[in-house]
């Protein structure tokens, strides 16, 4: 089976390509570095020739509200158009657990737009929503830092190893389209403060972390469970402790 992985040279995409190849599939990594530009459509038709499945794990280079919306809207439009013309039978997109609950944040409004376009396209699809990755701890801390202190929102988080996300995406890609959402999450739930502290420790980052009762997540007030997966989510195999031990 030929599977084209859009964003196939990045953190998740490279792992998806490796997992598919390991199981005997023809996995094609498509990205600007391989001559495929989903914003203009350049190289898409050639990459999709003979493909059964397209996996989209791209992300916007800018998280500014207008820029991220423009990225996902244009990229998704170009992909779906090319897929319809090529006869692709399954579109798989990576999204984020809680997207529908996080609409006060521009990034998640853009992801919701992406999901809606996929649903309305007529192309059979599966949307894989993942929780935040272990690897994102430092970036999340950066977004919450005030005067050298990380000010965490009073929420819970169920982070996951990027490799387990890639495994779930690859498994979904070679399965039957669900025409809906599947969720994947890590095995443990943490207070956001605790996760950030553990993640920073792995990087040798000494910033103090505190929880502020009125603390915001990307500028928005959340309910405690907004970032948690539902009861039917697939659970990744790798714990934060196991992943952390591998980094030292």
Give the ranges of each region predicted by the language model.
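Mobile cap/lid helix-loop segments that border enzyme active or cofactor-binding sites
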Residues: 189, 196-248
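Glycine-rich Rossmann NAD(P)(H)-binding loop
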Residues: 151-156, 182-189, 203
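A conserved pocket-lining segment of Rossmann-fold NAD(P)-dependent short-chain dehydrogenase/reductase
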Residues: 125-126, 139-160, 164
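Glycine/proline-rich active-site loop of Rossmann-fold NAD(P)-dependent oxidoreductases
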Residues: 135-141, 145-146, 172-182, 205-207
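NAD(P)H-binding glycine-rich loop region in Rossmannoid oxidoreductase-like domains
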Residues: 22-86, 97-106
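N-terminal Rossmann NAD(P)H-binding glycine-rich loop of SDR-like oxidoreductase domains
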Residues: 1-24
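Non-catalytic, hydrophobic alpha-helical segments
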Residues: 12, 54, 165-169, 184, ...
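Conserved beta-loop-beta element that borders a ligand/cofactor-binding pocket
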Residues: 87-90, 95, 113-136
